[in-house]
From Swiss-Prot:
Active-site residues, record numbering mapped to chain: 83 (tele-phosphohistidine intermediate)
Organism annotation: Borreliella burgdorferi (strain ATCC 35210 / DSM 4680 / CIP 102532 / B31) (Borrelia burgdorferi)
Role summary: The phosphoenolpyruvate-dependent sugar phosphotransferase system (sugar PTS), a major carbohydrate active transport system, catalyzes the phosphorylation of incoming sugar substrates concomitantly with their translocation across the cell membrane. The enzyme II complex composed of PtsG and Crr is involved in glucose transport.
GO CC term, one of those recorded: cytosol
Cofactor note: Binds 1 zinc ion per glycerol kinase EIIA-Glc dimer. The zinc ion is important for dimerization.
Keywords (A to Z) from UniProt: Cytoplasm, Kinase, Metal-binding, Phosphoprotein, Phosphotransferase system, Sugar transport, Transferase, Transport, Zinc
Gene that this sequence comes from: crr
PTM sites of type Phosphohistidine: 83
Cofactor(s) the record lists: Zn(2+)
Name recorded for this polypeptide: PTS system glucose-specific EIIA component
């Protein structure tokens, strides 16, 4: 650490679940671009609700014209990408209703896109929803919250944690997260 590094401010950003459901490791996503963290590091959620919410305050950078994904830029310079399902681009927007618009500032928990979850379950390859930090190479650390255990404690791991079978088993025992309420990612920049 150099002398000037002492004066650099670090920012911590807590991201809430943008959709209710079961949190899983990003490497379980059935799409190589997400599973290999090419798009960015983060988590995935197997959804149970019908709305995609803003995981934090920020400015909507992009909403795909098919309304299946959006990006959010925070004042701290963190770029978040929320992508509903796998190959849902092929649905040409069917099952998705845009609520917010590109370029607007949103607050944590605001609805960005409404979903017809039953239709999407029937017509998409997968509804697993990756939530990633697109510029994860520019952040100092990422912690993942996989939900709460039976004793109501949060199960949080860092990006340096090796996902052993024991840890994967513990993750599988967590309760589903609630959109707009439960922490899913903590990012330090």
């Amino acid at each position: 650490m150099g002398f000037l590094d002492f004066f650099k401010k670090t920012a911590t950003l807590d991201l809430i679940a943008p959709i209710s459901g079961k949190v899983m490791s990003i490497d379980k996503v059935p799409d190589e671009a997400f599973a290999e963290k090419i798009v960015g590091d983060g988590i995935a959620i197997l959804p149970t609700s019908n709305e995609l919410l803003a995981p934090c305050d920020g400015k909507i950078g992009k909403i795909f014209k098919t309304n299946h994904a959006f990006s959010l830029e925070t004042k701290e310079g963190v770029e978040i990408f929320v992508h509903f399902g796998i190959n849902t681009l092929n649905l040409n927007g069917k099952g998705f209703t845009r609520v917010a618009e590109e370029g607007i500032n949103v607050k944590q928990g605001e609805v960005i896109i409404r979903l017809d979850l039953e239709y999407l379950k029937e017509h998409s390859e997968s509804v697993i929803t990756p939530v990633v930090i697109a510029n994860s190479d520019e952040v100092s650390s990422i912690e993942y919250s996989f939900g709460r255990l039976e004793n109501d404690s949060e199960y949080i791991l860092s990006s340096s944690t090796v996902l052993t079978e024991e840890i994967r088993h513990k993750i599988s025992q967590t309760k589903p997260v609630i959109a707009g309420k439960d922490l899913v990612l903590r990012v330090k920049k």
